[in-house]
Curated annotation (Swiss-Prot):
Signal peptide: none annotated. One of its GO terms (molecular function) is UDP-4-amino-4-deoxy-L-arabinose aminotransferase. One of its GO terms (cellular component) is membrane. The gene is arnB. Keywords: Aminotransferase, Antibiotic resistance, Lipid A biosynthesis, Lipid biosynthesis, Lipid metabolism, Lipopolysaccharide biosynthesis, Pyridoxal phosphate, Transferase. Catalyzes the conversion of UDP-4-keto-arabinose (UDP-Ara4O) to UDP-4-amino-4-deoxy-L-arabinose (UDP-L-Ara4N). The modified arabinose is attached to lipid A and is required for resistance to polymyxin and cationic antimicrobial peptides. This is UDP-4-amino-4-deoxy-L-arabinose--oxoglutarate aminotransferase. It is an enzyme of class 2 (transferase). Homodimer. It comes from Sodalis glossinidius (strain morsitans). HAMAP family: ArnB_transfer. The modification N6-(pyridoxal phosphate)lysine is found at residue 182.
Length: 379
C-alpha cells in the first residue's frame, strides 16, 4: 500500500530551523524583536497601519471583540458554518451569537442575509473569508457603515487572499491564523490587522494582561512607562520562537499559494466529469489563496455519503478533513438554539469534505486522490 497521504502537512524546512536556532541563541525567546518584525512585515502585506501578533486567531478574536466593548445584551452576526471558536468567544463575553445562513455554493455570508439579521442590539458583524476566497467585503462594510456596526473579518483562511486587487483586511479590521494547517504557520499563532488606531491600542493592551507595555517594551524603554494595568486583560502574546518561523513562512507565502493553486486546478480538471461538487468561486474580482479544496458529496449522485467516502479514502491511505460541521448542530448550540434552521448550511455541513492540499504535494499525489474518488463513484 502507498504511504499515507495526509489531509495537510506544514511546509517547513531548513530556513525555519535556522530562524528558530537564531532566536534560541539570542537569549530572547518570548515576545521581542522577531515579533515586531513580523508585525511590520504583515502591515506591508495587507497595507494596514497596525498589525498585532497574538498566540492564536481565537485569542485575537477574543480581545478584538472585547476591545469593541461587547457584553451581555449585545448581538454579533456571524455564520454557523465556521470554526466554533468565534461563537465560543461571543458567548464567553456574555453576548448573543446570531448565526446566519450562507450561499449554498460559495459558502459565504451575503449582505442580504446579514441585513435581515440586524437588530438594534447588533454590535458587530463577523463575516468569514472561506477556504481561501474572500467574502464580498465592500458590500458588507457598506452595510456596517449604514447601520453603524463594526465589521471584523475572520481571515483565518485568507493569508494571501485578495479582493478587488487589495489584500483581505486592507482598510479594515481582520484576524488571520497561523495554525499548523494554514497557508503560513508557526504551529500556533495569529495576527490582528486594523486601521483603527484606538482599537489597535486596546487590543495591544488586552492581549498582554491589560498592561500598556510588554516585557520587550520595558527592556527597550526602561521602567518608563511603568507596566500598569489599564483594564484586566489576557495573555495572548506571540513568542519570538513562533514569530521567527512565521517570518520565514511569510517570505514563502506567494510561492506556497501558487503551488496550492496549481494543485487545485488539477483537482478541478480531474473531477470535472464526476458527481463530486467543488465550491463555486465568488463572482467578484479576487485572488484565491486555496487554503482548502472542498467537494460536496451527495449520496444520490455519488452512490456514497460523505462519511462513507471519508472512510473509503482512509482505507486507500488518503486523509481528509471536515470544514466545518455547522456550529448550530453541535450540542451546546443545538440545546441553546433548538429551533434554528439554516438550510444551505445544513445541506453543506453533512456533505462537505476537504481533500489533501498542501505545497509539498506532487502531481502524482493529486492523481492518486482523483483516481480513488473516481473508483469510489464508479466513473
Amino acid at each position: 500500500m502507498s504511504e499515507f497521504l495526509p489531509f495537510s502537512r506544514p511546509a517547513l524546512g531548513d530556513a525555519e530551523l535556522a530562524a528558530v536556532g537564531d532566536v534560541l541563541r539570542s537569549g530572547w525567546i518570548t515576545t521581542g524583536p522577531k515579533c515586531a518584525q513580523l508585525e511590520q512585515a504583515f502591515c506591508q502585506l495587507t497595507g494596514n497601519r497596525h498589525a498585532i501578533a497574538v498566540s492564536s486567531a481565537t485569542g485575537g478574536m477574543h480581545v478584538t471583540l472585547m476591545a469593541l466593548g461587547l457584553g451581555p445584551g449585545d448581538e454579533v452576526i456571524t455564520p454557523s458554518l465556521t470554526w466554533v471558536s468565534t461563537l465560543n468567544m461571543i458567548c464567553l463575553l456574555g453576548a448573543e451569537p446570531i448565526m446566519i445562513d450562507v450561499d449554498r455554493d460559495t459558502l459565504m455570508v451575503t449582505p442580504a442575509l446579514i441585513e435581515a439579521a440586524i437588530t438594534p442590539r447588533t454590535r458587530a458583524i463577523v463575516p468569514v473569508h472561506y477556504a481561501g476566497a474572500p467574502a464580498d467585503i465592500d458590500a458588507i462594510r457598506a452595510l456596517g457603515e449604514r447601520y453603524g456596526i463594526p465589521v471584523i473579518e475572520d481571515a483565518a483562511h485568507a493569508a494571501g487572499t485578495a479582493y478587488k486587487g487589495r489584500h483581505v483586511g486592507a482598510a479594515g479590521t481582520a484576524i488571520f491564523s497561523f495554525h499548523a494547517i494554514k497557508n503560513m504557520t508557526c504551529a500556533e499563532g495569529g495576527m490582528v490587522v486594523t486601521d483603527d488606531d484606538a482599537l489597535a491600542q486596546r487590543i495591544r493592551s488586552l492581549k498582554f494582561h491589560g498592561l500598556a507595555v510588554d516585557a520587550f517594551d520595558r527592556t527597550m524603554q526602561g521602567r518608563a512607562p511603568q507596566a500598569e494595568v489599564i483594564t484586566p486583560g489576557y495573555k495572548y502574546n506571540l513568542a519570538d520562537i513562533n514569530a521567527a518561523i512565521a517570518l520565514v513562512q511569510l517570505e514563502k507565502l506567494t510561492q506556497h499559494n501558487a503551488r496550492r493553486a496549481a494543485l487545485a486546478q488539477r483537482y478541478l480538471h480531474g473531477l470535472a466529469d464526476t458527481p463530486f461538487l467543488p465550491l463555486v468561486p465568488p463572482a467578484w474580482e479576487h485572488h484565491h489563496a486555496w487554503h482548502l479544496f472542498i467537494i460536496r458529496v451527495d449520496e444520490r449522485w455519488c452512490g456514497i455519503d460523505r462519511d462513507g467516502l471519508m472512510q473509503a479514502l482512509k482505507e486507500c491511505g488518503i486523509g481528509t478533513g471536515l470544514h466545518f460541521r455547522a456550529a448550530h448542530t453541535q450540542r451546546y448550540y443545538r440545546e441553546r438554539f433548538p429551533d434554528m434552521v439554516l438550510p444551505a448550511t445544513e445541506w453543506n455541513s453533512v456533505r462537505m469534505c476537504s481533500l489533501p492540499l498542501f505545497p509539498s504535494m506532487n502531481d502524482d499525489d493529486v492523481e492518486r486522490v482523483i483516481t480513488a474518488l473516481r473508483a469510489i463513484a464508479k466513473v
